[in-house]
Amino acid sequence: MTLPELPKDLVEEILSFVPATSLKRLRSTCKGWNRLFKDDKRFTRIHTEKAAKQFQPLTLTKNYRICPINVNLHGTTPSLEVKNEVSLLDPHSKNSAAQFNIDRVFHCDGLLLCTSQKDSRFVVWNPLTGVTKWIELGDRYNEGMAFILGYDNKSCNKSYKAMSFNYLDKDSEIYEFSSDSWRVIDDIIKPPHYMDYFRECFSLKGNTYWLGIDRRRRPPDLRITLIKFDFGTEKFGYVSLPPPCQVHGFEASNLSVVGDEKLSVLVQAGSTSKTEVWVTSKIGEANVVSWSKVLSLYPKPDVGFWHGLSFLLDEEKKVFLCCKSKGWMEEEDEDNVYIVGEDNKFILLNFGVETIGGESPIITTYVPSLVQIELAGSKRKTDY
């Protein structure tokens, strides 16, 4: 008996609820589905709105490779496993099997912006679909440059942009994906030049957030600031922080994202070991947000937090994963992380690999998606 063929609209409606990683496995099932997943921007937009998000932690190894991390917080014994590295071929190499050496990675909307040390280009990559876009920097390249990725979240059709900036310079440039062109943004209100910016930036709904410190102040009068770059208006702004961040003196402050709608900040008071984790309400257009305290801890003296430490929070379970610092005299070949809960219990887990983070591993979160990249006049490559 032959089953009746379902209407196209019904098939698309069903597929729009299937997680992105499962759709990848279905790509070879039907040529029509493959075209739908690869080229249909309308379906991509609907799928982004309806399908359940899959949050995948990633780390960078000492070999400049990205590796997914499986974290199990269920049961009485948490566990962590670093999976095999993800391949990103370097099309500019004479060796067809050569990998692109990644020293920094920035996630936005299912895309990874990857840079390589002392390399005058960067790549924007969708690991799920295999699509890459390589951007040459040419004469504008210098070793102090950093890059972030975003889009105008007020537009139905996302137009992606990358911003380049130098931590030691006030000049910034925007790269437009749709036109494959650069332009200087010198008419925006920027944070004061005396701000030190932490290198850990996070994207949320197309905009980028990171912490800064007023360099004119000295301990114990340091005060942190949460900075936002809006890719729609192309302006910087300041976002309110929870009460512990608004007082003088602190030992550490670290930023992270929770899901795809909230920010989290970890703050350790300077005078005590008390450490608090705060979470925002859902981030909207306004720079004023409300914060709620999720955890309050008193870590042991040998458990150190400092600026820029990577951490991931499970708000529902009230548990977070944070990277263990390496002491100056430690010579461990492999890195470790702590799993920390509201019972003030710190569980030490081994990474099993040596990561690129120097004194501490770097962990970020990636959300697989079908999102497509504007490719006007650019170099595009798809790896299946």
UniProtKB/Swiss-Prot annotation:
Xref: Pfam families: F-box (PF00646), FBA_1 (PF07734)
CDD domains cross-referenced by the UniProt entry: F-box_AtFBW1-like (cd22157)
Domain F-box, chain residue ranges per copy: 1-46
SMART domains, sorted: FBOX
PROSITE patterns named among the record's database cross-references: FBOX (PS50181)
Family annotation (PANTHER family): BNACNNG10540D PROTEIN, F-BOX PROTEIN CPR30-LIKE
Protein name per Swiss-Prot or TrEMBL: F-box protein At2g07140
Source species of the chain: Arabidopsis thaliana (Mouse-ear cress)
